[in-house]
Curated annotation (Swiss-Prot):
Its EC number is 2.4.1.10. It comes from the Bacteria. The active site is at residues 48, 278. Keywords: Carbohydrate metabolism, Glycosyltransferase, Secreted, Transferase. The gene is sacB. This is Levansucrase. It comes from Zymomonas mobilis subsp. mobilis (strain ATCC 31821 / ZM4 / CP4). It holds the Pfam family Glyco_hydro_68. It catalyses: [6)-beta-D-fructofuranosyl-(2->](n) alpha-D-glucopyranoside + sucrose = [6)-beta-D-fructofuranosyl-(2->](n+1) alpha-D-glucopyranoside + D-glucose. Belongs to the glycosyl hydrolase 68 family. The record marks 194 as: Transition state stabilizer.
Length: 423
């Protein structure tokens, strides 16, 4: 069904769908992480992480170096629980996608006009030799602001290291409009962040996914029958469910510089189900569109429950859907009940590898925990139609390249991808 703008109406993640979520499902549960995990750097907390990639989603190697980006905070200044107060985007590099070396902060000091740098994505600018664009969330506490933004610069490398230049001017891209997506006036618990930029293979246009909330005054609308879905007889929906209204949003780029954007209606909404659908991203495979997001146990609506982890939706009709929850419930990769907070902020790459960061690992003493702030073991995910399966555990922080970036054109990068696959 299309709305007046000619865009498909949002697909619904219903309460009936979420009732099928089961923690410890063996095909959708992350294996337990050992208490004695290694730390990639003892100077910085590391959490939300994403690779350097092309605009089509493939992980890029630049002059033989793999590069990843992460939110980081100085361990000597911030504790694990207040790390967001010092959040900046840092970068790491390695040969082959493991044993990462910290390179520094990406943005120049003072470039961000707001207090914090939160999650997004980083791409090689198409058709360029070494131009890089980071899309991130520029965040302020007072006044409350959360703005998807862009910053541009250049990547350089030699035999010893990788470094960046530029990244000294931030451009705001779009803001919550109160029409498609709740703004602060409508919902002071609003979410509007985590831009993920990509080219849609169906129409060749550039879009950005992001986390948002359904546009409405928080708590003023009752959860309807469509949002509830086909539930068993006598199933009651708690009144408090109306306070949860997550949405996976999308915007369309209006120029080649990717600095001007138009907001479109949400792709998926979770009104009455969950209040957060963070870091949405997309994988196109075998004619299907897989939409992934992450969410918390703590953000589920009253009367529902599920683990921290990855949730997903699949469309047989391209990026605008309609979507159905993967595995019937939406759960793709959850934490085990024995370690419910072991990992978070999973990112599913186009090769099926899933990276995340370690959060909190319990010891044999139930009163003793170890905070992570480092990358978790990488998981291999198999996507088969409307189902997903956990199949392998790789090394800690293993993020290998899929293509070698070549400056000439996109066709040469396709050839480089085949070369890497054949190695």
């Amino acid at each position: 069904m299309l709305n007046k703008a000619g865009i498909a109406e949002p697909s619904l993640w219903t309460r009936a769908d979420a009732m099928k979520v089961h923690t410890d499902d063996p095909t959708a549960t992350m294996p337990t992480i050992d208490y004695d995990f290694p730390v990639m750097t003892d100077k910085y907390w590391v959490w939300d992480t994403w690779p350097l990639r092309d605009i089509n989603g493939q992980v890029v190697s630049f002059q033989g170096w793999s590069v990843i980006f992460a939110l980081v905070a100085d361990r000597t200044k911030y504790g694990w629980h207040n790390r967001n107060d010092g959040a900046r985007i840092g970068y790491f590099y390695s040969r082959g996608g493991s044993n990462w070396i910290f390179g520094g902060h990406l943005l120049k000091d003072g470039a961000n006009p707001r207090s914090w740098e939160w999650s997004g994505c980083t791409i090689m600018a198409p058709g360029t030799a070494n131009s890089v664009e980071v899309f991130f969330t520029s965040v302020n506490d007072t006044p409350s602001e959360s703005v998807p933004a862009q910053c541009k610069g250049y990547i350089y490398a030699d035999d010893k290291s990788v470094w960046f230049d530029g990244f000294d001017k931030v451009t705001d891209l779009f803001q919550a409009d109160g029409l498609y997506y709740a703004d602060y006036a409508e919902n002071n618990f609003w979410d509007f962040r985590d831009p993920h930029v990509f080219i849609n293979p169906e129409d060749g246009k550039t879009y950005a996914l992001f986390e948002g909330n359904v546009a409405m005054e928080r708590g003023t609308v009752a959860v309807g029958e469509e949002e509830i879905g086909p539930v068993p007889p006598k199933t009651e929906t708690p009144d408090g469910a109306r306070y949860c209204a997550a949405a996976i949003g999308i915007a369309q780029a209006l120029n080649e510089a990717r600095t001007e954007w138009k907001l479109l209606p949400p792709l998926v909404t979770a009104f009455g189900v969950n209040d957060q659908t963070e870091r949405p991203h997309v994988v196109f495979q075998n004619g299907l569109t897989y939409l992934f997001t992450i969410s918390h146990h703590s953000t589920y609506a009253d009367g529902l429950s599920g683990p921290d982890g990855v949730y997903g939706f699949v469309s047989e009709n391209g990026i605008f859907g309609p979507y159905e929850p993967l595995n019937g419930s939406g759960l793709v990769l959850g934490n085990p009940s024995s370690q419910p907070y072991q990992a978070y902020s999973h990112y599913v790459m186009t090769n099926g590898l899933v990276t995340s960061f370690i959060d909190t690992i319990p010891s044999s003493d139930p009163n003793v925990y170890r905070y992570g702030g480092t990358l978790a073991p990488t998981i291999k995910l198999e996507l088969v139609g409307h189902r997903s399966f956990v199949t392998e555990v790789k090394g800690y922080g293993y993020i290998p390249p899929q293509i070698e970036w070549l400056a000439e054109d996109e066709s040469s990068n396709s050839a480089a991808a085949l070369s890497l696959l054949n190695k």
